[in-house]
Amino acid sequence: IPATPGMEIRGVTEMFPLNGPSWSLFYEYIGNILYALFIRRLPTKVLAALVLLAGCGLAAFAVWGPYGDICAGFSLTGDNIAGGSLRLLFSFSAGLLMSRVFRPVKVKGAVWVCSLGVVVLLAVPRIGGEENYWMNGLYDTLCFALAFPLLVYLGASGKTTDRTTARICKFMGDISYPLY
């Protein structure tokens, strides 16, 4: 059960103070309910419009919002509910859209290309500072709107052909959920 900001004793207003990452599962439940009731029935063009609208909303939240990023959703405050909902609507709908229109391309070493891409993107420190939140928001927008979907597309197109890569991928897959 989510904790309201007044009930959370550490003062960081986490929705799930005993298990911080559970906030994302909270939004996944909402996404699954929306999918079951509405989103799965949307025609592909309407789904694309939803992705575009949610992406624009999330970009506006990142660039002009209170944090200068999309790190929101972990608390039951207005800003966090708005940010978390936009994150859910964009990523969930974009994933569904990608699954509908996906046509694989040949990518040699996709797992290594995608891994390097993720490391490079996540290694960039916060940009701009308190006076220029918009700069980091713009970087976050470029990541979620262009870079991350491209990495997912390339990764989904790739095939592991050698034993070493297959073993590494299996190991990473096996530990990903327990670490989460």
Per-region residue spans from a language model:
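Membrane-interface helix-loop-helix regions
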Residues: 1-29, 57-67, 71, 78, ...
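Short active-site segment of divalent metal-dependent hydrolases/proteases
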Residues: 30-32, 90
